Amino acid sequence: KSVDDTIVIDFGSTKSSICKSVINHKNRSNFIASHPIAGTEYSGPHAAHFGLFDNKNVIICDYKKTKTKILDNALEIFLKMKMNVSYMDSVSHDKHIAYVSHLSHLSSFMLGKTVMDEEKNEKNIFNMAGSGFESTVRLAKSSPKMWADIFDDNKINIIKSLDDYIKNLEFFKLLIESKKFDELELLLNKTNYIKKILKGIN
């Protein structure tokens, strides 16, 4: 193929910085900035498995900067991978992904740290931790190197999402301390609505 037909696709978790870095590149129109919302807590070639992308979403950012022919070819690839395609600008992508992905990974890492700091005897963790704990800290098994890089690259949005999360945790703590358990239950009921949202996604 000629250079004009070459497709370069980025699959990283952040989009704004890489889109800025190539904005003036002579072959920018051959570039696809995408983020497949798929994966597991495992990394490396050994973690690959068939059907990983089936019915998963892939977000393409700043698509208007890509040539129509290149975009069409990329869409053909994604559709053959059985993925659902959506579009978003790179700045908005990084803002929202900080809340729905990066914050959950950060929380998983820090929950794991909190428990390990308190429970020096690993046997206590093994004997007492149930499926809820296991599912919540599952993401803490992810690659530390990769996630340190992600937290660095999207630090402004992650700090904002973390500030919001800490405010909610402090409010939750205050409700317990002040014994406002009716208000706490109401808060839990409102938050429980997220299961309907996630059911619609899945």
Residues of each region from the PLM?
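Rossmann-like NAD(P)(H) cofactor-binding subdomain of soluble oxidoreductases
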Residues: 1-46
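Alpha-helix N-cap/loop-to-helix initiation residues
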Residues: 15, 41, 66-67, 158
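Short, flexible, solvent-exposed loop/turn segments with mixed acidic/basic and small polar residues
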Residues: 47-52, 149
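Internal alpha-helical scaffold of NAD(P)-dependent oxidoreductase catalytic cores
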Residues: 50-138
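Interdomain hinge/lid region at the active-site interface
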Residues: 122-191
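Long, positively charged, glycine-interspersed low-complexity recognition regions
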Residues: 196-202
